[in-house]
């Protein structure tokens, strides 16, 4: 049986120990902290964030301060995460405004929370692409693709209907920003850069930034033998892009096993 998506805490936890402001936030199912809970449960059911792996962050693009970023902590079981367990960071200085360790112990049970090791990579997506959300999964399909492309720097696939779910991006010469100009077409070739894994997650930052810079048309970066980072202009766009890319990665694995090229000649 799959787990419930929404963070059902109203009858199980004493939210009265929180400030009125936080009580209001955590009672709103559309608040970024609750959306992270919802998506973590969904991604867990898809085997993308098992064993405390992976991570997600959401920028409050629809809130009073769109520079606020909510980030799931490191080393927690994603399917059990609660909204008060998020780190709150403000862009562009990347200042930490609140941590789960600031929350009353009645809720956190004195657990010592650590910031996500993905934080500098998430911040790169926000500052370089003005993303509204960034998702990091340990998808087996992502890992498998990087294994059969050992030594290659790119994943490519074309002429698959699902490609239409992904954005077509281009550099705006006036603003200097990468902007969405439409959606990819059936005949377009999707190219996702692959970077090499490192012993520590934060050490991936430079490689990820270089890939984002060198591939202006991408909404994702694969990490060999590790997983994938996907971002989008809103949390729901990032979710769609992640799902579409994972579908294409799974299909690519099966095509490889059947001797079918992923790019139609």
Curated annotation (Swiss-Prot):
Substrates-to-products reaction catalysed: 5-(methylsulfanyl)-D-ribulose 1-phosphate = 5-methylsulfanyl-2,3-dioxopentyl phosphate + H2O
Matching Pfam families: Aldolase_II (PF00596)
GO CC, alphabetical: cytoplasm
Cytoplasm among keywords: yes
Pathway as given in its UniProt record: Amino-acid biosynthesis; L-methionine biosynthesis via salvage pathway; L-methionine from S-methyl-5-thio-alpha-D-ribose 1-phosphate: step 2/6
Alphabetical UniProt keywords: Amino-acid biosynthesis, Cytoplasm, Lyase, Metal-binding, Methionine biosynthesis, Zinc
Enzyme Commission no: 4.2.1.109
EC primary class: lyase
Location of the active site: 161
Chief place where the protein resides: cytoplasm
Compartment annotation: Cytoplasm
Residues that hold Zn(2+) according to the record: 136, 138, 226
Essential cofactor(s): Zn(2+)
Gene Ontology biological-process annotations: L-methionine salvage from methylthioadenosine
Cofactor notes: Binds 1 zinc ion per subunit.
Function noted in UniProt: Catalyzes the dehydration of methylthioribulose-1-phosphate (MTRu-1-P) into 2,3-diketo-5-methylthiopentyl-1-phosphate (DK-MTP-1-P).
HAMAP family the UniProt entry points to: Salvage_MtnB_euk (MF_03116)
Name of the protein described by the UniProt record: Methylthioribulose-1-phosphate dehydratase
Organism from which the protein derives: Scheffersomyces stipitis (strain ATCC 58785 / CBS 6054 / NBRC 10063 / NRRL Y-11545) (Yeast)
């Amino acid at each position: 049986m799959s787990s419930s998506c929404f963070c059902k805490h109203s009858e199980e936890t004493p939210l009265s120990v929180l400030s009125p402001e936080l009580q209001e936030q955590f009672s709103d199912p559309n608040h970024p902290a609750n959306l992270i809970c919802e998506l973590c449960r969904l991604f867990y059911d898809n085997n993308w964030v098992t064993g405390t792996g992976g991570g997600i962050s959401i920028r409050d693009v629809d809130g009073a301060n769109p520079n606020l970023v909510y980030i799931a902590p490191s080393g927690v079981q994603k399917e059990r995460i609660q909204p008060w367990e998020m780190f709150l960071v403000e862009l562009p200085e990347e200042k930490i405004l609140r941590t789960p360790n600031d929350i009353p112990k009645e809720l956190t049970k004195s657990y010592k929370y650590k910031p996500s090791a993905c934080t500098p990579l998430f911040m790169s997506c926000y500052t370089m692409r003005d993303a509204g959300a960034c998702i990091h999964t340990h998808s087996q399909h992502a890992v498998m693709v990087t294994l059969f492309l050992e030594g290659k720097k790119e994943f490519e696939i074309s002429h698959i209907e699902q490609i239409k779910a992904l954005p077509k991006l281009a550099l705006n010469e006036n603003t200097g920003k990468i902007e969405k100009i439409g959606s990819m077409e059936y005949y377009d070739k999707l190219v996702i850069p692959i970077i090499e894994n490192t012993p520590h997650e934060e050490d991936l930052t430079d490689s990820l930034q270089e890939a984002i810079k060198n591939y202006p048309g991408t909404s994702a970066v694969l990490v060999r033998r590790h997983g994938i980072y996907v971002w989008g202009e809103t949390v729901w766009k990032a979710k769609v892009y992640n799902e579409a890319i994972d579908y294409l990665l799974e299909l690519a694995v099966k095509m490889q096993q059947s001797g079918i090229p992923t790019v139609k000649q």
